[in-house]
């Protein structure tokens, strides 16, 4: 700054500071303008040192002048500043900038005349080029000065800053003044990184060079001696000419200005680039309805500079288009200004115009003094004179408008002072600039209700408060319920804190400013002596008079201090006086936000009567409630509240003290559901080892969080009086009640919000929060750690959460969440198993709970036998004798718990390892560790999914449980050590379709090993006897039969009672296994039985399946096959007749074997077979299911995916960081997919509606993603009549079709990705390939053909179905060829032209049309030949 100050001497600086920026304006030049100018010059690659002399200033003006026409506002300001500075150096008296410019113009005109005169005098004697950088050296030769790095640097900066916006062109023009083509190429090379732009430029240059060559053909013959060749286009572009040649051409007589020509070409190219980078035509620049005029002008000129047009055209555009494209409000004003208005005048006139609402007001304000008629007013001269008196909406002073006001912005409406709307929307007529009626009465304390406080407050609110005394402000906190009542004036900061002050006998309005050191008032006379002073503020420096010891009264408080008087935009009371009157800034923390709670829809609050209580309980409750009422936790209520919940009292465990309990069961049933914020409890094995640890407990946790106001009435309860002496006392809760279902979730979320700022400020602290237990760990020294803990306690206290010392644990071992934490290990708090002679259900439940808790660290704990005792519904107090196994299990557990066991803490740098052992009877135990014998945690697994299972399956489930648990605790999966050989696993995995993925694992030889007890053969066993088995049962009587027929003619049938179809099928298999040799082939038609046995269970809850397993283990080889219905398969048809006798009536359909043949050939889908061969869908489906080509993974355990024609599965998948929404038509595999901008409900719903508009969608099946569960998607489904189903969370199989299509789609995208620039293109290409270019699957179709086929078939089937149902309403009476009697009535199955197909009892017959009478079934029986029915022909 010192260096810049040297530009002017002291005397010159005084002159400088007297010159006004504009004629009649208040602002004058300041030192800062010189500083700004010197910085700006550096950007233009001009030496700021030139500012120090008048000669330097003249050079700068000469450099800037050519760019003025096309330059920006900044360039113009720079020119004006340098011109004024030149006048100061030259000691030319000027009052303002305009005068300075006029003086410069005069001087330039004079010097021009002189130069012309001199040129005339000397003729063309001087050949010196005026073009810098070509200069004449002392020997008179023309030499080239290379373009300076400074110029190049300025050029690079311009391009980097402005990219290719219109400003680039004037800057290029200015920087390349007089340059040779070589210099210009240097400039272009420095910005060569912008390849696309440079390519466009190159093309323009090539076109121009070709055009030059066309217009300047080469002269024939040799060049005369001493003459230069003429430049070609490529010479001008500097590619085929040397620097010497370029200088020669430029300085020749007559010259060929190759530099200027080349520059012109480059500017043409730049214009094209600019148009591409900011492709707006000047005609498109229109002022928006609410756009400030100044912004519009900036846009207009920016685009104007990019236009390729002559200066005359540009001037015309400015004159006409600028006004023409302004918005209606500005246009009215501009037209009133008349045609010759300057831009400056236009901008002044249009200030503050912001949309239609302002029009009348701005005009009225700007012309408030005009009393002439409207027509006179609109004349330009009148308007000009009136324009000066504008008044500011913000501070109410005249001479400037709100946009330029330096006073802080007033909150609320500028017209009426009220909040909630802006001035343009104000309905009041009269603007009230001085705002006597401020939005709150002065000097009075203003009370907030808690809602009001919350309605307009961020978390912290700033208030200015005076104390009556000058004590510290420790007590000045708001009470927690939110009502604030101070005994001193309180000013909120929703408005500017303006107050009335009394000084020197005058009343003034002043702003309380805690950021100002001094008190500054606008011009006024004060008694006493004063000192001159300069003070700095946001708007620069101002000169003031300093008066000391001035008495001043602020809102009734007297103070004496220093007051500064000067040109301040607003009166300011600074800290020097505010501290005297005890004014402080307070930040009362806003009360905890209440979470809105509702009852379930259509329900009312609980109305449960209070049951009688003993005297001592009533006394205890009265005492507790009085105390709670004092603390504001509950409030008394009147009889208007109709709700009630019973209350009672119990003694606390450890004392004689009573505890109040409210039975909120009824209210809980009626309260809305909450999302549990924490899904599980934190586990110590997941804690990292910390140097310092503290455990805190929040006292009265729930009672520190307010309950939603509208919900409080439902928590009403009554304390009865003894002997009903008086009506009971009624209360309701103001805080979260214990025992109410919403308390945990609301407390957790409030606590998280409160701890968040503390967590952010202290990232080095680890804070685990579960309900009211806090674990805080850090690697700080204990002293620093404890300081942090105190900060945390203070932070919680500010929100009203106490952390009682009694439960504040500073030294290990720490008791936390039922665990004991030591510095380098952890365990569960000591567990004592009770010794009892008799055990009740409740005792056993508690015992199992304790053992489950201990199993986290004590390996080998079992509870299966104890749990078996609890099966069935029993009363809690029922005594249960322990079985021998349970006694044994309990004794083993006692042994395990005798030795205390410890776990260690997690080390993120080491791998996790999980080891599993089999304990027998379906129980497993596991340990997770990082170093051998140092367990992080242990556990057990004994869950049986499904009735029949085997060890491999259970092991897989255990692995998945442990993997999930590890992800929750440590965020990663461990490596597994499993007691199963790789071969066994591989066998199982390849054979069993439902085997799921398990993480990385290795075999560990810990007996007992897991093995498969038997294996089923893949091919029929040659030479072994084949048993066709079947069973049938009657649903009503529950009687059944099971049996078999063998290929050797053996057969057996047994009768069963109280059975089902499924049981009889299994019974038949059991019979076959019992009666067969060591090798056997078994053929069944039961999918159910096949499904159970193929999964190779080794134990089952079903006695029958267990017996089958025993038999299977005894066999050497077993082949089990499934066939669909029994027609045409000899053994099966026979056995079916055997077992069906008297059990079921099956109509065998001829079509089955034909359908099977057809399916083997073409693999047609079940729908096609059902319609072609008239099969029931279940049979057709089973044919497909038994085909190994169509069914890669066997039948699904829980039935197949639903393949109805209207079902689609939707899912989002991610690729390259983008979201692809995929919809798959389940039955055909046809895909619709799209890249969507975001995974939101809005986008999903839009996609869904598009899908429904293209295809018949009846059901969509999605996962539980938030976009699919959103209200928008539900609404779209409702509107389009689509049923929405959700998958099973965390079970990818429930979304199997779309998941596999995602993989397929990604695979195809991978194949075509390099053919497309954008992912969205690649996605559509992949969809096309998948739908139409990949054939295969059912029917050998492509997915596109298949969906059309399925939908068409579906329509036809429905039509056919309608006809069939119609046909079935008819009965047929027919004659046999040899028998003259009419037979019937038979059922009509099909009616053709010449014959009908009928079903009489179980026979299907074809009868010629002429021998059949078809009638409607009116329920009448045939009486004889001439019966009425016989004559009702149906043709």
From Swiss-Prot:
Binding residues for Mg(2+) 3: 1211, 1263, 1299
GO molecular function: aspartic-type endopeptidase activity; DNA binding; DNA-directed DNA polymerase activity; exoribonuclease H activity; lipid binding; RNA stem-loop binding; RNA-directed DNA polymerase activity; RNA-DNA hybrid ribonuclease activity
Region described as Disordered: 106-128
Region (Interaction with membrane phosphatidylinositol 4,5-bisphosphate): 73-77
Keyword Protease annotated: yes
Record domain Peptidase A2: where: 508-577
CDD domains, per database record: HIV_retropepsin_like, RT_Rtv
Annotated positions for site Cleavage: 132-133, 363-364, 377-378, 432-433, 440-441, 488-489, 587-588, 1027-1028, 1147-1148
Residues flagged as site, Cis/trans isomerization of proline peptide bond: 221-222
Segments forming Integrase-type zinc fingers: 1150-1191
Location of region: Interaction with host AP3D1: 12-19
Phosphotyrosine modifications at: 132
Domain (Reverse transcriptase): residue spans on this chain: 631-821
Note: HIV-1 lineages are divided in three main groups, M (for Major), O (for Outlier), and N (for New, or Non-M, Non-O). The vast majority of strains found worldwide belong to the group M. Group O seems to be endemic to and largely confined to Cameroon and neighboring countries in West Central Africa, where these viruses represent a small minority of HIV-1 strains. The group N is represented by a limited number of isolates from Cameroonian persons. The group M is further subdivided in 9 clades or subtypes (A to D, F to H, J and K). Resistance to inhibitors associated with mutations are observed both in viral protease and in reverse transcriptase. Most of the time, single mutations confer only a modest reduction in drug susceptibility. Combination of several mutations is usually required to develop a high-level drug resistance. These mutations are predominantly found in clade B viruses and not in other genotypes. They are listed in the clade B representative isolate HXB2 (AC P04585).
Protein's UniProt name: Gag-Pol polyprotein
Organism in which the protein naturally occurs: Human immunodeficiency virus type 1 group M subtype B (isolate YU-2) (HIV-1)
């Amino acid at each position: 700054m010192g260096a810049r100050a040297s530009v002017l001497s002291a005397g010159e600086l005084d002159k400088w500071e007297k010159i006004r920026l504009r004629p009649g304006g208040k602002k004058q030049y300041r030192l800062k303008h010189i500083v700004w100018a010197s910085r700006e010059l550096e950007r233009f690659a001009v030496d700021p040192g030139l500012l120090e002399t008048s000669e330097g200033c003249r050079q700068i003006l000469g450099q800037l002048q050519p760019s003025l026409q096309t330059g920006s506002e900044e360039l113009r300001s720079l020119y004006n500043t340098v011109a004024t500075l030149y006048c100061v150096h030259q000691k030319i008296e000027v009052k303002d900038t305009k005068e300075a410019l006029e003086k410069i113009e005069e001087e330039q005109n004079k010097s021009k005349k002189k130069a012309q005169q001199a040129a005339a005098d000397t003729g063309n004697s001087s050949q010196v080029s005026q073009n810098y950088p070509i200069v004449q050296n002392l020997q008179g030769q023309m030499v080239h000065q290379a373009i300076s790095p400074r110029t190049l640097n300025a050029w690079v900066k311009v391009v980097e800053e402005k990219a290719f916006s219109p400003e680039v062109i004037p800057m290029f023009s200015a920087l390349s003044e007089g340059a040779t083509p070589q210099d210009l190429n240097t400039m272009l090379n420095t910005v060569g990184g912008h390849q696309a732009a440079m390519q466009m430029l190159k093309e323009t240059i090539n076109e121009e060079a070709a055009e030059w060559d066309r217009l300047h053909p080469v002269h024939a013959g040799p060049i005369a001696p001493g003459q230069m060749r003429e430049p070609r286009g490529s010479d001008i572009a500097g590619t085929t000419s040397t620097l010497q040649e370029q200088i020669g051409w430029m300085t020749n007589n007559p010259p060929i200005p190759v530099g200027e020509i080349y520059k012109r070409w480059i500017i043409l190219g730049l214009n094209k680039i600019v148009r591409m980078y900011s492709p707006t035509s000047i005609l498109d620049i229109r002022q928006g309805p609410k756009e400030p005029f100044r912004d519009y002008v900036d846009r207009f000129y920016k685009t104007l500079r990019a236009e390729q047009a002559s200066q005359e055209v540009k001037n015309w555009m400015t004159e006409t288009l600028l006004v023409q494209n302004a918005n209606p409000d500005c246009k009215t004003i501009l037209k009133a200004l008349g045609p010759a208005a300057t831009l400056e005048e236009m901008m002044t006139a249009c200030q503050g115009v912001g949309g239609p609402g302002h029009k009348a007001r701005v005009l009225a304000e700007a012309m408030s003094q005009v009393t002439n008629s409207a027509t006179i007013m609109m004349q330009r001269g009148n308007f000009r004179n009136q324009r000066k008196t504008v008044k500011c909406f913000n501070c109410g002073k005249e001479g400037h408008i709100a946009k330029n006001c330096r006073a802080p912005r007033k909150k609320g409406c500028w017209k009426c002072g009220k909040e909630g709307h802006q001035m343009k929307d104000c309905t009041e007529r009269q603007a009230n600039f001085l705002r006597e009626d401020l939005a709150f009465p002065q000097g009075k304390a203003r009370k907030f209700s808690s809602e009001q406080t919350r309605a307009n407050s961020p978390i912290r609110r700033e208030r200015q408060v005076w104390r009556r005394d000058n004590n510290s402000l420790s007590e000045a906190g708001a009470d927690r319920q939110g009502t604030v009542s101070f005994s001193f004036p309180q000013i909120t900061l929703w408005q500017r804190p303006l107050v009335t002050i009394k000084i020197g006998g005058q009343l003034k309005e002043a702003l309380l400013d805690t950021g100002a050191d001094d008190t500054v008032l606008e011009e006024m006379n004060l008694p006493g002596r004063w000192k001159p002073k300069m003070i700095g503020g946001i708007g620069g420096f101002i000169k003031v008079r300093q008066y000391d010891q001035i008495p001043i009264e602020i809102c009734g408080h007297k103070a004496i201090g220093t007051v500064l008087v000067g040109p301040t935009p607003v009166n300011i009371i600074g800290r020097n006086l505010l501290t005297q009157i005890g004014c402080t800034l307070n930040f009362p923390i806003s009360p905890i936000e209440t979470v809105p709670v509702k009852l379930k829809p259509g329900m009312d609050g609980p109305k449960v009567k209070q049951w009688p209580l003993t005297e001592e309980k009533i006394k205890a409750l009265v005492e507790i409630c009085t105390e709670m009422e004092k603390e504001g936790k509950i409030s008394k209520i009147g009889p208007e509240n109709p709700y009630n919940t019973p209350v009672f009292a119990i003694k606390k465990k450890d004392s004689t003290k009573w505890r109040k309990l409210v039975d909120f069961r009824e209210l809980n049933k009626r309260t809305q559901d909450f999302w549990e914020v924490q899904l599980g409890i934190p586990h110590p094995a997941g804690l990292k080892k910390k140097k310092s640890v503290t455990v805190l407990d929040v006292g009265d946790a729930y009672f520190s969080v307010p309950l939603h106001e509208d919900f409080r009435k439902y928590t009403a309860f009554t304390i009865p009086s003894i002997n009903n002496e008086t009506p009971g006392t009624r209360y309701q809760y103001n805080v979260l009640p214990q025992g109410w279902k919403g308390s945990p979730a609301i407390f957790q979320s409030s606590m998280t919000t409160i701890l968040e700022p503390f967590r952010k400020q202290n990232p080095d602290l680890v804070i685990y929060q579960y309900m009211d237990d806090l674990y805080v760990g850090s690697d700080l020294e204990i002293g620093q750690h404890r300081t942090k803990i105190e900060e945390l306690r203070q932070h919680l206290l500010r929100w009203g959460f106490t952390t009682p010392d009694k439960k504040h644990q500073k030294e290990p071992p720490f008791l936390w969440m039922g665990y004991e934490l030591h510095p380098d290990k952890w365990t569960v708090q000591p567990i004592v198993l009770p010794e009892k002679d008799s055990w009740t259900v409740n005792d056993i439940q508690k015992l199992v709970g304790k053992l489950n808790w201990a199993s986290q660290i004590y390996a080998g704990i079992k509870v299966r036998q104890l749990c078996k005792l609890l099966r069935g519904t029993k009363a809690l107090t029922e005594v249960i004798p322990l079985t021998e196994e349970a006694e044994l299990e309990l004794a083993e557990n006692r042994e395990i718990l005798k030795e205390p066991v410890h776990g260690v803490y997690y080390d993120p740098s080491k791998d996790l390892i999980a080891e599993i052992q089999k304990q027998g009877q379906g129980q497993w135990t596991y340990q997770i560790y990082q170093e051998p014998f140092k367990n992080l945690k242990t556990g057990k697994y004994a869950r049986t999914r499904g009735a029949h299972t085997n060890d491999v399956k259970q092991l897989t489930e255990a692995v998945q449980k442990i993997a999930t648990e590890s992800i929750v605790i440590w965020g990663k999966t461990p490596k597994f050590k499993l007691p199963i050989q790789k071969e066994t696993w591989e066998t199982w995995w390849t054979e069993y379709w439902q085997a799921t993925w398990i993480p990385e694992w290795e075999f560990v030889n810990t007996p007992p090993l897991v093995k498969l007890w038997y294996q089923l053969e893949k091919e029929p066993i040659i030479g072994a006897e084949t048993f066709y088995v079947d069973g049938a049962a009657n649903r009503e009587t529950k009687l059944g039969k099971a049996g078999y027929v063998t290929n050797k003619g053996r057969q057996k049938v047994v009768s069963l009672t109280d059975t089902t179809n499924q049981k009889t099928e299994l019974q038949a298999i059991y019979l076959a296994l019992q009666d067969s040799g060591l090798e056997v082939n078994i053929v069944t038609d039961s999918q159910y039985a096949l499904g159970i046995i193929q999964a190779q269970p080794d134990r089952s809850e079903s006695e029958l399946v267990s017996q089958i397993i025993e038999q299977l283990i005894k066999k050497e080889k077993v082949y089990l096959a499934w066939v669909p219905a029994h027609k045409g398969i000899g053994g099966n048809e026979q056995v079916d007749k055997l077992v069906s006798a008297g059990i079921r009536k099956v109509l065998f359909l001829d079509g089955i074997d034909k359908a099977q043949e057809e399916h083997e050939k073409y693999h047609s889908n079940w729908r096609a077979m059902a319609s072609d061969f008239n099969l029931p869908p279940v049979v057709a489906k089973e044919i497909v299911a038994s085909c190994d080509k169509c069914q890669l993974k066997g039948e699904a355990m829980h039935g197949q995916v639903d393949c109805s024609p209207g079902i689609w599965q939707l899912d989002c998948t991610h690729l390259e960081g983008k979201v692809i929404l995929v919809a798959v038509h389940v039955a055909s595999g046809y895909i619709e997919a799209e890249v969507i901008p975001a995974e939101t409900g809005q986008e999903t719903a839009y996609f869904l509606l598009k899908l429904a508009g293209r295809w018949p969608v009846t059901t969509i099946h999605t996962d539980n993603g938030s976009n699919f569960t959103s209200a928008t998607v539900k609404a779209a489904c409702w509107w389009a009549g689509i049923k929405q189903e959700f998958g099973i969370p965390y079970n990818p199989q429930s979304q199997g079709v779309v998941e596999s299509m995602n993989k397929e789609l990604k695979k195809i995208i991978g194949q075509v990705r390099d053919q497309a620039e954008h992912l969205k293109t690649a996605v559509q290409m992949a969809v096309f390939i998948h739908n139409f270019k990949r054939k295969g699957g059912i029917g050998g179709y492509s997915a596109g053909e298949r969906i059309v086929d399925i939908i068409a078939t579906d329509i036809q089937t429905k039509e056919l179905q309608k006809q069939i149902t119609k046909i079935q309403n008819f009965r047929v009476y027919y004659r046999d060829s040899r028998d003259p009697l009419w037979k019937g009535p038979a059922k009509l199955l099909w009616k053709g032209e010449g014959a009908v197909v009928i079903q009489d009892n179980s026979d299907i017959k074809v009868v010629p049309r002429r021998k059949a009478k078809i009638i409607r079934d009116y329920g009448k029986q045939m009486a004889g030949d001439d019966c009425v029915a016989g004559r009702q022909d149906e043709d």
